[in-house]
Amino acid sequence: MIKEFREFISRGNVIDLAVGVIVGAAFTAIINSLVNDIINPLIGLLVGGRADFSNYFIPLAGQTATTLAEAQAAGPVLAYGSFLTAVINFLLIAFVVFMIVRTVNRMRSKPEAVPPAPPEPTPSERLLAEIRDLLARQG
């Protein structure tokens, strides 16, 4: 059983998947930082304030609170700001993955080989073509 497990783990696909998961986790942290530390402040600059979507919420029980944590402690809350941040993160990750896949596909695709020009006919072939043409004209 240990031997089978070792063979399973040593297959390329499993190792590639593990590397992909680890890189994906690290990439998620980078995207979160990009959204929270760069994109949201730029949006805040454009709309004239701080674009902190994490505190955008609608209390469902009618309570009032200034932060999402306070509102969640007081009762049910629609935290649409957190959802908006997750959507922005997803769109950024999807775009970056699309660009990576697109680049890899372009690198993989080989330009179509141009077929070589047909070789010049040999003197014998030219002579045979002339004989054929003469016979065709005669009837």
UniProtKB/Swiss-Prot annotation:
Species of provenance: Chloroflexus aurantiacus (strain ATCC 29366 / DSM 635 / J-10-fl)
* Membrane topology note: Multi-pass membrane protein
What does the subunit comment say? Answer: Homopentamer.
Q: Does the keyword Lipid metabolism apply?
A: no
Q: Which UniProt keywords apply?
A: Cell membrane, Ion channel, Ion transport, Membrane, Transmembrane, Transmembrane helix, Transport
Q: What is the name of this protein?
A: Large-conductance mechanosensitive channel
One GO term describing the cellular component: membrane
Q: What does this protein do?
A: Channel that opens in response to stretch forces in the membrane lipid bilayer. May participate in the regulation of osmotic pressure changes within the cell.
**GO terms (BP aspect):** monoatomic ion transport
**Pfam family membership, one:** MscL
Q: Which family does it belong to?
A: Belongs to the MscL family.
Q: Where does the chain cross the membrane? A: 14-34, 81-101
